[in-house]
Amino acid sequence: MYDDSYVPGFEDSEAGSADSYTSRPSLDSDVSLEEDRESARREVESQAQQQLERAKHKPVAFAVRTNVSYCGVLDEECPVQGSGVNFEAKDFLHIKEKYSNDWWIGRLVKEGGDIAFIPSPQRLESIRLKQEQKARRSGNPSSLSDIGNRRSPPPSLAKQKQKQAEHVPPYDVVPSMRPVVLVGPSLKGYEVTDMMQKALFDFLKHRFDGRISITRVTADLSLAKRSVLNNPGKRTIIERSSARSSIAEVQSEIERIFELAKSLQLVVLDADTINHPAQLAKTSLAPIIVFVKVSSPKVLQRLIRSRGKSQMKHLTVQMMAYDKLVQCPPESFDVILDENQLDDACEHLAEYLEVYWRATHHPAPGPGMLGPPSAIPGLQNQQLLGERGEEHSPLERDSLMPSDEASESSRQAWTGSSQRSSRHLEEDYADAYQDLYQPHRQHTSGLPSANGHDPQDRLLAQDSEHDHNDRNWQRNRPWPKDSY
């Protein structure tokens, strides 16, 4: 009688039990997969951390200047959480190696800056696109109202601005060490400016002995604009219009400066044609601009008059150059030397360069290690570095070759700075950059390298057999005045 009976809910409960039974392995497998993923993530992060540590002992491959801001702490996709770099626009980064297509390994150039993960240009572009999509979805009332309230720009102008915005890369490749360039107080090639700058060159050569390369550059570096070097059409126009400095010579000089900077020594350029910061603003050199500034135009006039009639004939052009420099905003320069005494100005510059030296040299790796030409293949077309062997070009050998004449003249000028009087100057400028340093642009061999010279304490020793070199110094400039 019970065979045909039906118990309500029995079949349903059986089915339910079967369903619940078969669903348990699915839940267990989900948990297992989650654990596997977490384990794999920890393994990848551990390997990334190890690679980060190994990178501390690797040389700098190249350097970049940032055009955007980035906060690595907020980036959840960083290979090691909390190990992303933070930087603002116009900061400098030393790149050690490539970790992946989205990440590099390097450090922010600052004191105490540690090795960290740096987003690649592809990564930054991806972030920018996501932010734009998010902004379009959410809508920005303030921006919409602004657009409605103002007149639309002409189509051509709008397209031009859009094109410029689209073509600004997140990074610009720059020398691993920013080259130091002196400007002021007036035009190079005239005695007052040359003497004051030569005093600083001599000081730097001995203060940073073994850590500095001082090299002469005669090519017009103002032609080394990124837009020109990357545009064959503009390059041809400039080569036709420039009688004194071809673009090929400029390109060669840029490559030489990049090569010098790879050693992570301080690089100082005795650049003949650079008299204003705007001349290098659009180049890839990212220089440290040092403004040698006198206290007033009257002081500069007195200094020029003290050099005799040959310099007085060109007083007007020198004063015009001085006016252009003092009209520049302070942010145009990295260092302004406005001290009234040479020793104070030298110490000011030395303190700045010591801080920069510590910022560019991470404690772990050796400061003199040379990096490979390029660790990132994707940036080879952006870099201005050529494949160069160990041999220097004739111009480079000439610039870096120690010159006995130049060295002895520098020592004599430096030694005499504490002995000669500055009676030609007014009392308010009594000890300011004593009138002792003759124009240094007579040397065809350029300034010698800091390496291999006598230590600074030997500069105080008198060497009477070379006194006649100082007295018989030739004042004739080797180049026409109109080239300045």
Curated annotation (Swiss-Prot):
Belongs to the calcium channel beta subunit family. GO terms for biological process: calcium ion transmembrane transport; calcium ion transmembrane transport via high voltage-gated calcium channel; calcium ion transport; calcium ion transport into cytosol; cellular response to hypoxia; chemical synaptic transmission; detection of mechanical stimulus involved in sensory perception of pain; negative regulation of detection of mechanical stimulus involved in sensory perception of touch. Residues 409-420 have a biased composition (Polar residues). This is Voltage-dependent L-type calcium channel subunit beta-3. Component of a calcium channel complex consisting of a pore-forming alpha subunit (CACNA1C) and the ancillary subunits CACNB3 and CACNA2D1. The channel complex contains alpha, beta, gamma and delta subunits in a 1:1:1:1 ratio. Interacts with CACNA2D4. Interacts with FASLG. Interacts with CBARP; prevents the interaction of CACNB3 with the alpha subunit CACNA1C thereby negatively regulating the activity of the corresponding calcium channel. It comes from Rattus norvegicus (Rat). GO terms for cellular component: apical plasma membrane; cytoplasm; L-type voltage-gated calcium channel complex; membrane; synapse; voltage-gated calcium channel complex. Gene3D superfamilies: P-loop containing nucleotide triphosphate hydrolases (3.40.50.300), SH3 Domains (2.30.30.40). The keyword DNA-binding does not apply. Detected in brain. Residues 59-128 form the SH3 domain. Residues 1-52, 129-170, 388-484 are annotated as: Disordered. The modification Phosphoserine is found at residues 152, 393. Keywords: Calcium, Calcium channel, Calcium transport, Cytoplasm, Ion channel, Ion transport, Phosphoprotein, SH3 domain, Transport, Voltage-gated channel. Its main location: cytoplasm. Residues 195-345 are annotated as: Mediates interaction with the alpha subunit. It holds the Pfam family VGCC_beta4Aa_N. It is found in: Cytoplasm. Regulatory subunit of the voltage-gated calcium channel that gives rise to L-type calcium currents. Increases CACNA1B peak calcium current and shifts the voltage dependencies of channel activation and inactivation. Increases CACNA1C peak calcium current and shifts the voltage dependencies of channel activation and inactivation. SMART domains: GuKc.
